[in-house]
């Protein structure tokens, strides 16, 4: 039976809408330009925020950035650091945020240029840090809760030779200092003699700690100078170490490639 030309033409014209309908239901919530601007979602949207992934195999040991997170020598936290510079609600084609934060805020990394001006001028920035040091087997240890990390404390930890990455969990975690917006000078950190003992007597090249500085407030610059003098030790600060057992893990830390910056936010995870 011959198909009337008009019927054939109408069938061809209807194919695009049929394809769009199939695509919307099978592959995408909507095809751009064919659905309302809300995307056509009917279910209530609730983002899932995790600390642990893979049934306890992956631990996120980085802190979330919020206006209330502590900032160096501030009683008010970092404050507003993120804003929506372009908004779809105001007619923009997409949402685009901008941010402004100190590079040594939250979970972050120090480069040698942080305390050595000659290294800063020479270009020893976070882009020059060795990712091989920032990724690999790491030991999470608990530090005695009542003191800063001195040479005596380092000796008492009995960290074996050959261990190159150590995360030091201190009283800072128990006190939840990284969850308090007011900067606290009584945090636990390395004294100069503890830093020197580590450099002289261990193979540690990655030093991680659970507040904004690896160095105790009373030995702030001297301890940093010891750690960063040889440009081989990398400092990761502001780690979130609650809820993780002491022991051996695979650590993975990735700073931003900020050319010219002596510090950078860093995302760190532990894999069991």
From Swiss-Prot:
Disruption phenotype: No visible phenotype under normal growth conditions, but the double mutants cyclase1 and cyclase2 are embryonic lethal. GO terms for molecular function: arylformamidase activity. GO terms for biological process: L-tryptophan catabolic process to kynurenine. The keyword Protein transport does not apply. Its main location: secreted. SUPFAM superfamilies: Putative cyclase. Disulfide bonds: none annotated. May function redundantly with CYCLASE1 for normal plant growth, development and viability. This is Cyclase-like protein 2. It comes from Arabidopsis thaliana (Mouse-ear cress). The lineage of its organism: Eukaryota, Viridiplantae, Streptophyta, Embryophyta, Tracheophyta.
């Amino acid at each position: 039976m011959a198909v009337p030309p008009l019927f054939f033409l109408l069938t061809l014209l209807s194919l695009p809408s049929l394809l769009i309908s199939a695509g919307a239901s099978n592959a995408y919530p909507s095809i751009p330009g064919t659905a309302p601007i809300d995307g056509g979602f009917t279910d209530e949207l609730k983002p899932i925020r995790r600390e642990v992934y893979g049934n306890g195999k992956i631990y996120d040991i980085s802190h979330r950035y919020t206006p209330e997170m502590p900032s160096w020598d501030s009683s008010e936290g970092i404050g507003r650091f993120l804003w929506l510079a372009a908004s779809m609600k105001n007619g923009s084609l997409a949402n685009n945020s901008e941010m402004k934060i100190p590079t040594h805020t939250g979970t972050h990394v120090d480069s040698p240029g942080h305390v050595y001006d000659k290294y800063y001028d020479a270009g020893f920035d976070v882009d020059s840090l060795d990712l091989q040091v920032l990724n690999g087997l790491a030991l999470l240890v608990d530090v005695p809760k009542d003191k800063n990390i001195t040479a005596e404390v380092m000796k008492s930890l009995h960290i074996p030779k050959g261990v190159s990455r150590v995360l030091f969990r201190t009283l800072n975690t128990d006190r939840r200092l990284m969850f308090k917006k007011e900067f606290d000078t009584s945090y636990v950190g390395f004294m100069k003699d503890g830093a020197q003992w580590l450099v002289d007597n261990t193979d540690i090249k990655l030093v991680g700690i659970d507040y904004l500085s690896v160095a105790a407030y009373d030995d702030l610059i001297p301890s940093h100078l010891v750690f960063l003098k040889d440009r081989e030790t990398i400092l990761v600060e502001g780690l979130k170490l609650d809820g993780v057992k002491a022991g051996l893990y695979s650590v993975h830390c990735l700073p931003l490639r900020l050319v010219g910056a002596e510090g950078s936010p860093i995302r760190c995870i532990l894999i069991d």
